[in-house]
Amino acid sequence: VALGGCLPTVQLGR
């Protein structure tokens, strides 16, 4: 869960 554009973060860390 890293804010960069990973798998689950594509909805909140784009």
From Swiss-Prot:
UniProt keyword annotation of Secreted present: yes
Cofactor binding description: Binds 2 calcium ions per subunit. Binds 1 heme b (iron(II)-protoporphyrin IX) group per subunit.
Q: What class of enzyme is it?
A: oxidoreductase
Q: Which GO terms describe its biological process?
A: hydrogen peroxide catabolic process
Q: Does the keyword Electron transport apply?
A: no
Cofactor(s) listed: Ca(2+); heme b
Q: Where, per UniProt, does this protein localize?
A: Secreted
Indicate where this protein is primarily found: secreted
Q: Which GO terms describe its molecular function?
A: lactoperoxidase activity; metal ion binding
What Enzyme Commission number does this protein have? 1.11.1.7
Keywords per UniProt: Calcium, Heme, Hydrogen peroxide, Iron, Metal-binding, Oxidoreductase, Peroxidase, Secreted
Supply one GO CC term from the record: extracellular region
**Domain of life assignment:** Eukaryota
The catalysed reaction is: 2 a phenolic donor + H2O2 = 2 a phenolic radical donor + 2 H2O
Question: Which family, according to UniProt?
Answer: Belongs to the peroxidase family. Classical plant (class III) peroxidase subfamily.
Q: Say what the protein does.
A: Removal of H(2)O(2), oxidation of toxic reductants, biosynthesis and degradation of lignin, suberization, auxin catabolism, response to environmental stresses such as wounding, pathogen attack and oxidative stress. These functions might be dependent on each isozyme/isoform in each plant tissue.
Name the chain's protein. Answer: Peroxidase 5
Origin organism is Betula pendula
